[in-house]
From Swiss-Prot:
GO terms for cellular component: cytosol; nucleus. Its main location: cytoplasm. It is found in: Cytoplasm; Nucleus. This is Acireductone dioxygenase 4. InterPro entries: ARD, ARD_euk, RmlC-like_jellyroll, RmlC_Cupin_sf. Its cofactor is Fe(2+); Ni(2+). Pathway: Amino-acid biosynthesis; L-methionine biosynthesis via salvage pathway; L-methionine from S-methyl-5-thio-alpha-D-ribose 1-phosphate: step 5/6. The gene is ARD4. Binds either 1 Fe or Ni cation per monomer. Iron-binding promotes an acireductone dioxygenase reaction producing 2-keto-4-methylthiobutyrate, while nickel-binding promotes an acireductone dioxygenase reaction producing 3-(methylsulfanyl)propanoate. Ni(2+) binds at H89, H91, E95, H134.
Amino acid sequence: MALEAWFMDDSNEDQRLPHHRNPKELVSLDYLAELGVLYWKLNPENYENDSELSKIREDRGYDYMDLLDLCPEKVSNYEEKLKNFFTEHIHKDEEIRYCLAGSGYFDVRDKDDRWIRIWMQPGDLIVLPAGIYHRFTLDASNYIKLMRLFVGEPVWTPYNRPQEEHPVRKKYIHGLTYKFGETVKAH
């Protein structure tokens, strides 16, 4: 099964719900790629010996890896951490996540400042580009096991919105402007 993504509704209900619009408005992998979001479907049961994962890591320079179990039983201050992850932010570097078990949502902003919800399930590996506004939450299952990949030592520093003057945000917006061939208002 391929990655599922859709435009979100404007509801303030529980962040762990799907938040589909009515009718549903699905988002293609091609559209995500235009935003700089990359995707691979891998075998999470064989991640330790997966040659495709090894090739991705080698090609993209991901030389650091760790595993993260997110659930109320394994994370102290779980609700507070989930709230922090759900605060809209950017990073200076790519955010690379590979879902090994469970499920959750990455939300990203498109060029028109609309939220797109990406449902991560086992086998989904995504790369969010540096400078894209995004956030993360678990879904109603309240469990996900993620592999985090980094170039070099891990740095996970969120820069909460607004960050329009941040150099990495400007670079991201410039890239969108070039890709779409039109001026894109910074969000």
